[in-house]
Amino acid sequence: MYVATNDYIYKTRDAGRTWTNLSQGMSYSRVIAMAIDPVYPATVYAGTKGDAVYKSHDGGQRWTSMRSGLDDVTITSVVNQFLFDPADAQHIFLATTMGVFETKNGGEQWTKKMKGMKEVLMVVTLGMDPARPSILYAGTSGGVYKSTDQAGHWEKMNNGLVPPDMLKTSRALNVTAILVDPYEPDTVYAASLAGLYKSTDGATSWKRIGESLADQMIIAMVLDRTRRGVIYITGRDGVHRSEDAGATWKLINSGLATTNIRTIAQSATDPKLFYAGTNGSGLYRSKDAGETWESMPMVGGKS
């Protein structure tokens, strides 16, 4: 498992008992996003703030800059997310504050893919229809965009997300996460800094859900891949879980020393195992689908 902090990338091979600092070949830029090649797990990608993309072929031991086509990166530019084409691990989409980029050769060359995104200032997140991978969704500072041709062209899909008088603005709605239901491909969830939304018609229209949540600033979201209708969201109020597709919510913070949760992830091998990254209080793990959490101190490792 890899963990990116404000300072370094860490890796554990023993479920968090010991950690190794992985930084050889990287700048001191903050790592914002990481991704593991689904075919060759020793190949790892890191997206940074200010220094574009790095790639490692040996499990993070050595890193190489992969910024060809990302040359307009500035010190404030952020790589937010990697998204793999399930049919080709060399084909990757990138969500950045400069827009959407695509590579077809594992990061050797990146191409900007922003046709139709006229008002967008930044792209925060990308989602893919698992049943129809040519369909992509982009969560941006201006709301949601959809592509039906693998980012060849984008169309704004903000009906119900924001008031009509704000539909054309570049900061209509800051979307932080967008996910497609693996059981119902036309059902899409969009988390934002102003609440949670759901579409049942492929983003043609949206409805607000989760209005009972005390804090409407949603930072991260996960759809349980093995349990239909189960959603996890995080923010300044901790972790919430819904077991009825967003109709009702349960706060699941037992064991957390802080409620400011910045990210959440479900294990690829154990569906009951979840990880939560906090803002300044380290990493937590749950072995019971979020009912209880335990701290995972990053100590006992080596550089």
Language-model features: where?
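Extracellular glycan-interacting surfaces
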Residues: 1-303
